Amino acid sequence: MVIKKESSYFERLQQIAVSGFSPSALTSYVRNPIDFYASKILRVSDMEDVEENIAANTMGSIIHEALDKLYQPYVGRILIKADFDQIKKQMLPELEVAYQKEYISTSDPVGKNKIIYEVSLHYIKKMVQSDLDLVQNGCELIIKSVERKLEAEIKVPQIGKVKIHGMVDRIDQLDGKLRIIDYKSGATDKGNVGIDPEDFNILSGDYKKAKAFQVLMYSYLYSLNEPFTEASAGIISFKNFDQGYIPFAFKAGRSYQEKMIDVEVLQNFEQVLFALIQELFNKEIHLTEKPV
């Protein structure tokens, strides 16, 4: 399927440019331009996708909300063991509040709701325990922010002013190292967050690198709001939590080595971001369906 970009497309695209492009909106275009057209331009959803993803999205929202509330009181301070004693006491109350926010009764969850409840609790416990282990092993952990909304206005060549935005799940400082972290309820591996250092363009060409694109865009946004010299950016996947924090990395042979986000990385990402937005606005490039 091929769709030509008509005036109505550009009118809606300009609205998005004013309200803001998110990482998920841009990676939906990378995944399949026709899906981007349907969801962002026409604002309709594939009901099969909605049905498939609703449980995962609900659980993800519950975990994010609960962790946000659990850590919010401790933002900006060095965490100690006593803090985790209090966090653990608040685990069930905050989980129930997060559950109610998703319009799910917690009085006696059954069936799929019971599974969502128990799995959410399991992941929250693992996350808190992981942080406690760091502290007990002598690491200095400071939560700088949770659920941080970032936005910025950028000037894209040939396009003009465009707004971008994103919600960063967690920004912390571990033994002095700034970390920009995105939580994922689905599985993630190093290959999803790593790229060949000579091929930044893969970020806008291969949806398998969507997670790398996301953490780089969060880093780019953060740098525009709070400039930094270097930072680590990565994923914590609840599905394969045992892998721990999975940072953005460069491919080195058959393995991946963590790459700190510095000025050069941000400049390379900016070029990819600009080119992707320019493609969206290019009337000569039609929307062509990709196999998903």
Residue ranges and their predicted role:
Residues 1-292:
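RecB-family 4Fe-4S metal-dependent nuclease core
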